[in-house]
Amino acid sequence: DGECIFGQHSAAQTHLEGQGVGLGDVFVFFGLFAEEETGEPHHRIFGYLRVEEMIPLAGGAPADLVALRHPHALAMHSANDVIWRGEGRTAKRAGESLRLTVPGGPPSLWKRPEWLKRGGLSYHDREDRWLHGKRLRSVARGQEFVADIGRRQAPREWLARVIDEIKAS
């Protein structure tokens, strides 16, 4: 229906708070997939959420989220359990532009947009992660990587293309 409801808690939520993630920001979700023809594992972007509302659950979950049976609304996972809510969708098909893993590479070896440089993605500060040829060796664990794009035009255009691809699928 065009709405995304995402729950987060514990260290991951603390990281998001520490990075200043909030209203108006956009989550870009990725996961591990397998190519249909070859079974090749790879990371791929599969959805997004434009944050319109942040709902701390420490004071109780809103009735509409309980009625939807959202896992974070049914039972608190930790003291800092939060629901992130807003416009969002998942991709219906796997367009090549949403693939993160370089062709033929291990899942953790990503192609990266030109605008994304060392120091621009949380958890990826080590120099050896930023490789020639616009590649990034992604950390093996984690899911909340924050890129503060500010008002820069190139990352905003990249994000718009990703969202357009998801909506068009």
Please identify what each model-predicted range represents.
Residues 1-42:
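Short N-terminal edge-element motif at the start of the domain
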Residues 13, 33, 48, 110-113:
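Generic detector of bulky aromatic hydrophobic side chains
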Residues 38-55:
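Short beta-strand-centered aromatic/proline hotspots
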Residues 54-169:
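Contiguous surface segments at macromolecular interaction interfaces
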